[in-house]
Amino acid sequence: MKSDIEICQTATLTRMKTIASNLGLHDDDITPQGPFKAKVNIDALKRLKSEPNGKLILVSAITPTPLGEGKTVTTIGLAQGLAKLGESVSACIRQPSMGPVFGVKGGAAGGGYSQVAPMEELNLHLTGDIHAITAAHNLASAAIDARIYHEQRLGYDVFSEKNELPALRIDPQHVVWKRVMDHNDRALRMVTIGKNEDGKTINGYEREDGFDITAASELMAILALATDLQDLRQRIGRIVVAYNLDGEPVTTEDLQVAGAMTVTMKFAINPTLMQTLEGVPTFVHSGPFANIAHGNSSIIADNIALKLTDYTVTEGGFGSDMGFEKACNIKAPLSEKSPDCAVLVATLRGIKANSGLFPLSPGQSLPKELFAPNKEALDAGLDNLLWHINNCAKYGLPVVVAINRFPEDTQEELDSLLNWVSNLDMNVDVAISEAFVKGGNGTLELAEKVIKACQQETQFTPLYTSEMSLFDKLNAVAIKGYGAERIELSEKAQQQLATFEKLGYQSLSVCMAKTPASISTDGNIKGAPTDFIVPIRELKLCAGAGFIYALCGNVMTMPGLPEKPAFMNLDIDGDGNIVGLS
């Protein structure tokens, strides 16, 4: 079989104006970005406002191996399968960060014959939204240090009188807004800025700082959760970047930089329209990670897609304890549209990996034993699959398990898994997906079962309400969402929690940043652990995004590169063809 990029480069694609027209978009709704992608003007929603919403299908997965279990392949393949059945359908996915593209996982366009195309354009820059977010974010960083420099250089009173601006009196030791870049670079996690020659301050005042990956920026979450340009502007203005010498929050509005940040992101608020290899329209917008942010594509993209097609297929990052949980508890209440069906992706290798019988390490190849028949490992890993089925069902949604088939899978083990799921006494269906090898033809049975599931009445119920305290919300996610015994706040986190509630932020949602390698916060614990403790070492306020960000365990907001990064495989030939991208 050809490589992903070879399949994509030899595919016959439809011009984007035709894709948009067939979708119901007008010429003035789109701004073409070359022949095969276009920006969709958010104003299209005003014209479509009276149209009914279609069905929203949310794709999730079991606890994944480091290489993933094929959520995006299934998302794209399912959309193609629905189209082959004659249904009106679109897909919504996140824009890939170049960190993973050059790091461990590679691209995020799907794979095989279920890809978004052109995949090299999707995986590398696309229409520049991530770069716009990086620029807007770092503009705020520059504004913070410039304000500290000028206020301290002149003195607060002189600065205020000279510039007719209030002195913000930012505490340099209490700046909470790190800089960002769209690469994995562990050397930038902790840096010292403002270094000068002895006795000089021309480079600013020295302080400790650091970098996060752009996908972890609050601006990325804001872009994904904003409902229109005005909402984007208001959310950016609420961002807390530092605290003053009295412990009071300093916002981007206080710095008078929020307007310029929004201007920098003006074009980024418009989703990018692409297509699958089979011509299914696909909206690509925003890219928050699910382990260090809320891990879902944008509300704006969903809203446009839901107005234009009868079915919209989207995905939440990592397992159902991660992006799916955050879609239900953070995204859905803001979008006022809950999912109609959950599709849970499982693989034989992923189930075996959750048996706990094999060592798994990020950046390393999967043990070869995962690809061989092994009844003991398969049986031992079923607890994880059952946990994720129950987790999706607890939100009041019908569940369809999609078994993503790999070439080495045996029919005997596949039949065993099909029978096991079919015999569960609950509202769950199951089908094998061969989206990677067969495209939409490999998901026809899955598509039929998803259509059937979408006809059911849902009883969607998030885990918590906005009226609950922040502590109770954190406990709700840990206990109801993960099956933990309780949360355990560090002394620092306790102080931060008290501060946030004192400042009036108790109505915000909570976003857990934890390892995706386990339902718990310890990536070495596989299966379906119970009665464990969720340690929260630090809390971060994301007032613009509308959530409190809880750092659990040792999760990093700036990834590092592995021993053998994916960028080693990339090159370009004399004709400009990219090779080695996956």
Curated annotation (Swiss-Prot):
It is an enzyme of class 6 (ligase). One of its GO terms (biological process) is tetrahydrofolate interconversion. Its EC number is 6.3.4.3. The gene is fhs. ATP binds at residues 65-72. It catalyses: (6S)-5,6,7,8-tetrahydrofolate + formate + ATP = (6R)-10-formyltetrahydrofolate + ADP + phosphate. Keywords: ATP-binding, Ligase, Nucleotide-binding, One-carbon metabolism. This is Formate--tetrahydrofolate ligase. The keyword Coiled coil does not apply. Pathway: One-carbon metabolism; tetrahydrofolate interconversion. Belongs to the formate--tetrahydrofolate ligase family. Pfam families: FTHFS (PF01268). One of its GO terms (molecular function) is formate-tetrahydrofolate ligase activity.
